[in-house]
Swiss-Prot record:
Protein's gene: RGR1
Localization in the cell: Nucleus
Protein name listed in UniProt: Mediator of RNA polymerase II transcription subunit 14
Cited function: Component of the Mediator complex, a coactivator involved in the regulated transcription of nearly all RNA polymerase II-dependent genes. Mediator functions as a bridge to convey information from gene-specific regulatory proteins to the basal RNA polymerase II transcription machinery. Mediator is recruited to promoters by direct interactions with regulatory proteins and serves as a scaffold for the assembly of a functional preinitiation complex with RNA polymerase II and the general transcription factors.
PANTHER family: MEDIATOR COMPLEX SUBUNIT (PTHR12809), MEDIATOR OF RNA POLYMERASE II TRANSCRIPTION SUBUNIT 14 (PTHR12809:SF2)
Organism listed in the record: Eremothecium gossypii (strain ATCC 10895 / CBS 109.51 / FGSC 9923 / NRRL Y-1056)
Amino acid sequence: MTIAVKESKILYGNFDKAKSGIMKGSGGIVEQGPGLQQRIITPAKEMPPEIPHVEFNQLPLSVLIRNLTVYAAKELSQYMKTNVRSTQDASTRKMEFLRLIIFLRNQFLRLYVLVKWCKTIRQNNFHTMIDLLNWFRGTNIIVNNCLLALKDMSTSMAGAKLPNPDLITALEVLMLGRPDLPTHGFLLTGDENGQQANKIPAKLILKRFRDLNTCLSVKISLMDLPAEMHTYSIKDGRITFTVFPEFEISLSTIDRESPLFFVDVKFLFNENKFPLNTTKIALLVNDILYKSPTPLLSLYQFLHRYVLTLQLYMIHVELQDIETNGKYSGGNLAHHYDPKKNIISLRYWLQSKMNSKCKALIGVEKTSQSIILQWHLPDTKEEGKTTKYNNLLGNIEAILDEITFNHARIIMSELLDTGLFEGDDNKNDTSDTLFFHVPVICVATAPVQLKINTISGIFYFKNPSALLLSYAKQLNQTSDLDDVVNILERLRMDKIVHILRNMFEKTGWICEDVVKLNKPILYDKHKDKKRILTRDLFIRIKDWPANWFFILNLVASGATCIVEKLIGKVQSVKGTWEVKYLDQGNLQVSKLESITYQNVMHMQKTIIQKILNHMIIDSLNELKISKVICQGEASQKLPAYVQTNTAGASNVSIIAIGLESFLQGSKALSDTLESTIFLKMDYEQNEVKLFGKFKKDTQMIRYQCDDLLINFIDKRGLAFHMTEDFTSLNHVVQYLTKFRQKLMQLVVLTDVTEKLHNNFRSEHFQIVKLRPNEISFRYLKNSKDDQDCTIQIVTNETKIEKLQVQLSPLNPQNIIQKYLECDKYDPHFIFNYLHFTSKLFSAVKSIESITNTNTMTITLHLHTLAAYQLSYHDRLTGGQIALCIDLRNSPSRAGSMYHLYFAQEDYSASKNPMYPAILQVINNVFMLNNNTKRKVPSVIRLGTGVACPLGDIEPLLEEIHSILIRS
């Protein structure tokens, strides 16, 4: 071991040249004799160096056993989990499990052997063995590194094919620093003071150079030269080819039969920026010159490709420097170098959304075999046009500046062609500024300067405001120039909206920001037109009715803006704003320049009338009511009773309303009121009136009902009006509903009173109380009650639901009340029935009041509205008589008649004590051949009964009753 160490130190030691025969090293003294033999003299008492002590990467035995146990348990558990549902057969799984057990056993066994081995060491000093093992490993690494270095040297020198003398010379240079040339008097020791040998004469050297020049001239003249290598020079035994601006290569040869070999190469574009591996180049060049049948042509092709590859790599390095430290740093430029394809893909303006069009390609052009940069022009008018740039090396940054500038100019030119911008007339063609005019007031505009940053491709405004900054951000988020134009037009529209909002808000208007429709009102009208923007501005005054707005429809195209003024109603339905009403009949169109503060203030005073008109019209539309606004010539055709009340009044609006649609087609309309009513709004008096007129004189006119708010106008009392004062604009529509309800009540009351008078044609009929929903009247003869009947008119907000007839408890017809409550009968039938049956019930009541004593009881029973039974009961004798009274239609006579007859059981009951009375009535009243004088001439005798008209029922009942009582 000691000898090996000493030899290595001698090999790499520093030699002392003080004595020619002795070399000194750090580990001993080497004596050198004439035969170059060496003998090592080792000092007698030299101690070996201490082994370095190792203290890191050591664990206690307990921790090592614990870790190994945990590892073994996890491995077994993981194996069990992963092999539960394995598709392998049982034998394969068993073998895998056995291998796992053996592996874990070996780990524990190694630990056991290590523990046993440590016990055999004296004093348990096993740390010395660990230190020794570490030293062996370090030494082994050094030796391995030397072997690897020698292997690399052998590999790199494999192509040199040097003869053995050259290898010996190389070994001499390696050991001594220079070759040992005995022929020139050089010694292996490097001693320069030795005896000098004879040198080669200079004439011989020059003669050899001349011979080589002649040989090269002859050799080159016999070889095929590529056109690029026709420029060459032969000097000092070598031929130098200059291919400008690529390379300069020197070749030489030994004789005419030997091939050319590499001497030196110089790249004319490199300027020593990159270290070149000339050794590898020499190997490749010599291989080409030796093997190729056309060596110079192959050499040029190889060097040309090598130059192109090297130049492309240098461009790649230059781009990296520009991206990192140049003006395009900060993520504005990126490139991808593909060494296999020799292509560099270049992308600029990465921060711009237009980066998909910002591309360039650097590669080798096939036709010229030179490196070019190919830039596809992003001009939509000239698709497929490209620009090529040469001489890239060292000029790539200037070329990028030119590309970005031209790209910015193209974008500016395309924007200028849209007609939305103006160029800078005061500067030359290199100006990068466009002027975009935006309004500052309705009648004036100001230019805004739009520019493009040629480094980043970002649009920006000069001296921007907050609004311009927000729109600059939008401009840089789009890649389409059409979108850029649309964004700038939206900028102009926003400025217009800002100006109008400012004007209206300063004059007391309120601009609603909450109201936002899904699409502008005029969107469908202009959606097929290009470069037309529409915007809605919803404006109102604080005291206006809710949901009603003065709407400004802005239509902008280029520098022109048209303002359409509308009145509409907008409501929120399930979170979505919808237009419920829009006045497009009175559309007012004006230019933006015509809107002034005076116009805005004037509209504030005059528009309230239109708002209320349209609010009423909208309410009428919701109710599906026909209407016409009376203005212009239509106002001159109003009826006299309407014109009289509106003559000389200002700020008055009149709306003609169809009565039938207003009252939803009531049957009483055709005979009661005129078909048209008029609604008048007086905005100065804050008064709303409804005018109407009866078609003819009716009974209703003679009655006074204060609750109906009716005021008659003319002397005949046919025209009338209803009046309400309003204090809030929101309540105007409520008054319209109130008028509708009162008018409906008026029509119903008129219809009901007419029907009552037509049905109760007697001097006893009298209306005693008249209210909008109630009519009380008397119609019975000798009635002592305040009212015999009360009619309740049941209505809802829009129509009359039903009429409820309530008979007085003292009314003898109260027995039919249950039939009147079933809602099956028409009011006309009820009134007619009450009238023609009133005498029957009055007669029965009179008979009951006179006859009902302790001995005789008379009771009226009602089977149906057309079948009655008058029962007599004698309490003394127990006799009973049932007189049936039926109301039947008479085919021979118009109208109905009463049929009176006794019940069938009364004829067969011969033991009935009152049977003689029945026979007497039959003989005197019912028999056909009875010649007695009739008390009621209109009576028709039927044998088993009798029939009489409705008006003669009272004397007939009295006659029959008198016979039955006397008997």
